């Protein structure tokens, strides 16, 4: 379901809104009954190698294997009608984004418990949930009964001119982040995934920013107007470079990241932003230290902003990336979505 980077022409929407059927089916189940498990399996995910799921592996699990993103809303609606207690997502970050987006109209603010089997090229959510790379379906089902529960709220991103086109995901980036994602696709082709891909693209981006002029795409960034909720106050600018541009923006509700990076410093809970102005070459050299929490003091004066927010609106002149896929330039509202329980070992 998650493919090469491209802009959504249109988003698939569930024809069933609300979750009354799912709630009713779940309420009918006797106390102590075996949980009903649904599985979304994406054969296109990197580590699934294009193979269909062997149904003998999970005879007691309701399996949905949508061949295309457009089929996902109906697949989720059928699982909801069965009153599932646990929804297992077999795929990477892009598959998780698609499930959350397409399931928004079905489950609303009351989702079943989720589990993620990290099978994609990037699996940042699984890193945050401390999920083993080889986590199995049976292990996820066992964790529903005996494992830990971790609560996370995905970000909800809404185009201000298309409020019905809300999407949900965990990592949003713009400016140099967009270029870095494209470079990451090249790193994937070379066989670098997850933490290694993060290292490769970070190194390449620093080289570009270090030796390029402010006209270099890695240093130029994108025009961004960032307004913080609830009062619409503009995010401060250090005055370095063009005050209408930001070299990079990253927003997320995750708390732990691949390769141990800490882009938000000591901030952990809720929605967080890291925004970089067109910083000096000296500050560019310090970026690796900043990412690992050992950067210089006075980061804001040096053009690097780390903050928590209840939400924000952004207008930008270039596409942004949400969990590996590009969305068009425009004006958007970004805020925390529903709180969802995930199982972990």
Q: Residues of each region from the PLM?
A:
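Short, well-ordered alpha-helical microsegments
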Residues: 72, 96-97, 257-259, 329
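Glycine-rich phosphate/pyrophosphate-binding beta-alpha loops
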Residues: 173, 177, 248-262, 326
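ATP/NTP phosphate-donor binding region
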Residues: 1-90, 94-106, 134-142
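Histidine- and/or cysteine-centered catalytic micro-motif in compact active-site loops
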Residues: 229-231, 251-256, 276-280
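Short helix/loop capping segments that flank catalytic or ligand/cofactor-binding pockets
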Residues: 48-49, 179-180, 258-260, 322-323
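ATP/nucleoside-binding phosphotransfer catalytic cores, i.e., glycine-rich phosphate-binding loops
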Residues: 2-28, 39, 235-243, 259-345
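Short aromatic-centered micro-motifs
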Residues: 63, 226-228, 320
């Amino acid at each position: 379901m998650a493919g090469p980077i491209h802009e959504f022409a249109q988003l698939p929407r569930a024809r069933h809104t609300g979750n009354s059927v799912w709630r009713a089916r779940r309420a009918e189940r006797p106390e102590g009954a075996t949980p009903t498990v649904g599985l979304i399996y994406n054969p296109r995910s990197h580590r699934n190698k294009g193979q269909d799921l062997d149904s003998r592996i999970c005879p007691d699990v309701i399996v949905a294997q949508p061949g295309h993103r457009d089929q996902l809303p109906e697949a989720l609606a059928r699982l909801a009608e069965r009153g599932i207690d646990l929804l297992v997502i077999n795929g990477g970050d892009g598959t998780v984004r698609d499930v959350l987006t397409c399931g928004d109209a079905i489950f609303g603010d009351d989702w079943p418990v989720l589990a993620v089997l990290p099978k994609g090229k990037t699996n940042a959510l699984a890193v945050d949930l401390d999920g083993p790379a080889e986590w199995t379906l049976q292990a996820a089902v066992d964790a529903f009964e005996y494992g830990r529960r971790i609560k996370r709220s995905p970000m909800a991103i809404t185009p201000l001119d298309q409020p019905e086109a809300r999407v949900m995901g965990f990592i949003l980036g713009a400016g140099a982040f967009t270029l870095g994602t494209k470079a990451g696709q090249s790193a994937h082709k070379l066989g670098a995934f997850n933490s290694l891909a993060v290292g490769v693209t970070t190194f390449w981006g620093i080289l570009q920013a270090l030796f390029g002029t402010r006209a270099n795409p890695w240093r130029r960034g994108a025009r961004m107007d960032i307004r913080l909720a609830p009062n619409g106050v503009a995010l401060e600018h250090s005055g370095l470079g063009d005050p209408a541009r930001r070299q990079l923006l990253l927003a997320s509700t995750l708390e732990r990241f691949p390769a141990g990076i800490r882009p938000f410093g000591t901030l952990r809970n809720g929605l967080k932003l890291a925004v970089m102005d067109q910083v000096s070459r000296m500050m560019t050299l310090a970026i690796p230290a900043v990412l690992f929490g050992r950067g210089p003091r006075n980061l804001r004066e040096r053009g690097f902003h780390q903050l928590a927010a209840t939400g924000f609106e952004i207008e930008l002149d270039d596409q942004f990336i949400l969990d590996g896929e590009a969305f068009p330039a425009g004006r958007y509202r970004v805020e925390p979505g529903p709180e969802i329980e995930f199982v972990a070992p």
